[in-house]
Structure formats: structure tokens, C-alpha cells
């Protein structure tokens, strides 16, 4: 594309946009997903969220700003891997009082009943605020289970509250309380 001809300024990772996903150099151009230079991760759900912001701003004028709350990600290998929030290194460097809960859970019933060869988790908890700040999972259910951790981080659900939840059993979600 000849972006210069359209007076569209670009950065290393895409079109230089403002908080409305509008080009900073050509107000008639909007960009979303991987085409936009934003803080969003190059993931399909981020591109989808961006597209909703762009559509709203095209139809209603620049009234909706892009926000990137907690964004979970998954790798669809066998077993699946998923993460959300801070890495262990980021959490420890954040100055918070971090507790790391980590375990191979291949022998838990949830995973034995489906003949999984390997399942494990690492959950990072800010002990002073009883908040999850990161979660990293490996299992066949990791892609679904990570969304529960993303919800907890996004809405500040405490580990105490999560432990009180009653989930359907036997499901991967029913194991959350034992991961905290």
C-alpha cells in the first residue's frame, strides 16, 4: 500500500492512530487490529474489539475510545497453553508482595478422566490485596479456563471470593479453588 500517497502516517507496527483508532495524519482513515499501531496484542479478539470501536466511531463520530483491559491468550497446541496478566518476572518486579502457586496437576481427576498426559498451572497472587495478577495454564482445557482468570483479574475478584464459587463438577473450572 502506498500510505504516503494517502497522507497516512505509519509507525513500525502499523498506522499511527489516536485513541479513537483514527489516523493522526488523515482523519478519514481508521485502522484496527494488526494494521493499527496500538498497545493491543496481535490477537484476533483484540482486532475484533478494535473493529467495534472503529465501527462505532465511523457511525457516531469519535465517541468511543479503545481500551485494552486484561487480554487472555491461548496457543492451540496439544496440550493447549494459555496465559493472562503478568508473567512471574513482571509480577516480582512490580514491587508487590507476590505469591506464586505452581503445580503439575496431571494426576487430578479432571485431567485423568480425559486421559491428559500433562496439565499444570502457575497462578500469581498479590497477597496484600488478595488479587490474582497473572495465570499461566497448560492443559486441554487451558483455552477455556484462562477466561475465568481473566474475568477475576479484570473485575478484581478476590481469591477468597473465587474459592467460594461453586462450579459444575468435574470441570476444569471446578479446580480453580485448588489453584489459589
Swiss-Prot record:
Annotated source species: Staphylococcus aureus
Protein name per its UniProtKB record: Uncharacterized 19.7 kDa protein in mercuric resistance operon
Alphabetized Gene3D superfamilies for the sequence: 3.30.390.30, FAD/NAD(P)-binding domain (3.50.50.60)
Keyword vocabulary terms for this entry: Plasmid
Residues spanning the signal sequence: none
SUPFAM superfamilies named among the record's database cross-references: FAD/NAD(P)-binding domain, FAD/NAD-linked reductases, dimerisation (C-terminal) domain
Amino acid at each position: 500500500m502506498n500510505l504516503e500517497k494517502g497522507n497516512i502516517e505509519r509507525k513500525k507496527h502499523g498506522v499511527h492512530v489516536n485513541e479513537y483508532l483514527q489516523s493522526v495524519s488523515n482523519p478519514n482513515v481508521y485502522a484496527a487490529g494488526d494494521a493499527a499501531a496500538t498497545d493491543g496484542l496481535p490477537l484476533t479478539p483484540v482486532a475484533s474489539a478494535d473493529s467495534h470501536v472503529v465501527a462505532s466511531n465511523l457511525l457516531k463520530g469519535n465517541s468511543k475510545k479503545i481500551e485494552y483491559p486484561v487480554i487472555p491468550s491461548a496457543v492451540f497446541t496439544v496440550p493447549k497453553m494459555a496465559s493472562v496478566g503478568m508473567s512471574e518476572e513482571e509480577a516480582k518486579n512490580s514491587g508487590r508482595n507476590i505469591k506464586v502457586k505452581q503445580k503439575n496437576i496431571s494426576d487430578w481427576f479432571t485431567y485423568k478422566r480425559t486421559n491428559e498426559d500433562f496439565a499444570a498451572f502457575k497462578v500469581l497472587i498479590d497477597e496484600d490485596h488478595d488479587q490474582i495478577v497473572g495465570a499461566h495454564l497448560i492443559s486441554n482445557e487451558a483455552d477455556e479456563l484462562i477466561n475465568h482468570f481473566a474475568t477475576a483479574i479484570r473485575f478484581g475478584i478476590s481469591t477468597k471470593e473465587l474459592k467460594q464459587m461453586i462450579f459444575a463438577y468435574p470441570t476444569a473450572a471446578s479446580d480453580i479453588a485448588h489453584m489459589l
